[in-house]
Amino acid sequence: MTDVSRKIRAWGRRLMIGTAAAVVLPGLVGLAGGAATAGAFSRPGLPVEYLQVPSPSMGRDIKVQFQSGGNNSPAVYLLDGLRAQDDYNGWDINTPAFEWYYQSGLSIVMPVGGQSSFYSDWYSPACGKAGCQTYKWETLLTSELPQWLSANRAVKPTGSAAIGLSMAGSSAMILAAYHPQQFIYAGSLSALLDPSQGMGPSLIGLAMGDAGGYKAADMWGPSSDPAWERNDPTQQIPKLVANNTRLWVYCGNGTPNELGGANIPAEFLENFVRSSNLKFQDAYNAAGGHNAVFNFPPNGTHSWEYWGAQLNAMKGDLQSSLGAG
């Protein structure tokens, strides 16, 4: 076989793989970590509040689940996945997060809603199957919400953490990169950490279309727009290193263990995003970063059992890093 023939066959295989991923990925996203049955986990007796926080930038009140860690306590913002619901935050639906962090000295903040938003300020109205609305989630999380919590719930407005799974893992990194005084800690669990690269924009667009009928171009424009790299954690490593942001980065390899998550969508998705996490680690180390926990075990699927275990495991690190009393 000639070199030319080999190259043609190689490119053919790549095209087939890319096409298959483009077709399969949105459906898998819909199944893995998808919409859960409505009904929060938090047991009766926990001091969980259901707040309505005004958002002038979005023109409506935003529901926020909240548990106080005490006066002037630092906040941990728990951000939801691609299929975030409008009734409860996925962290409450799928994990006992409020229970784990009760009396921890940390205020737990769970914004509700934001399906397919990437917790970003969108260029255009977010128009999907349920109609159109304004998405200015970065403004909410970095200005409106911390100011409201400081004034109304005595939450420390700076020195917070952002923790996200899947879609929101990259969002947590970006919030910390551009708002280092507010977010000194970012946790990314099973996220695609190079969304601007390769087929990332196309696959994200397909997934967003499947999860609510949204368009990636309404969010960050075409793939050539600078907003894609602006919201790419790997591209923003220099900022994270310069800020000395504390990072907690987790990704499994698609192999289930005793925690569960043994289904093809969850296994495929976790394996799919793992390489971007390994590349992020290499780039972070090469940039001189030295304030991160990287956890890449030989197991773990794209499911809540593993994300909950990570949130529980990082509790001590969060308390130490944020100076919880």
UniProtKB/Swiss-Prot annotation:
It catalyses: 2 alpha,alpha'-trehalose 6-mycolate = alpha,alpha'-trehalose 6,6'-bismycolate + alpha,alpha-trehalose; an acyl-CoA + a 1,2-diacyl-sn-glycerol = a triacyl-sn-glycerol + CoA. Residues 1-40 form the signal peptide. InterPro entries: AB_hydrolase_fold (IPR029058), Esterase-like (IPR000801), Mycobacterial_A85_antigen (IPR050583). One of its GO terms (molecular function) is diacylglycerol O-acyltransferase activity. Disulfide bonds join C127-C132. Coiled coil: none annotated. The gene is fbpB. Keywords: Acyltransferase, Disulfide bond, Secreted, Signal, Transferase. Belongs to the mycobacterial A85 antigen family. Transmembrane segments: none annotated. The active site is at S166 (nucleophile), E270, H302. It is found in: Secreted. Its main location: secreted. Its EC number is 2.3.1.122, 2.3.1.20. The lineage of its organism: Bacteria, Bacillati, Actinomycetota, Actinomycetes, Mycobacteriales. This is Diacylglycerol acyltransferase/mycolyltransferase Ag85B. Substrate binds at L82, R83, S166, D194, F272, V273, R274, S275, K279, H302, S303, W304. Residues 98-108 are annotated as: Fibronectin-binding. The antigen 85 proteins (FbpA, FbpB, FbpC) are responsible for the high affinity of mycobacteria for fibronectin, a large adhesive glycoprotein, which facilitates the attachment of Mycobacteria to murine alveolar macrophages (AMs). They also help to maintain the integrity of the cell wall by catalyzing the transfer of mycolic acids to cell wall arabinogalactan and through the synthesis of alpha,alpha-trehalose dimycolate (TDM, cord factor). It is an enzyme of class 2 (transferase). GO terms for cellular component: extracellular region. It comes from Mycobacterium bovis (strain BCG / Pasteur 1173P2).
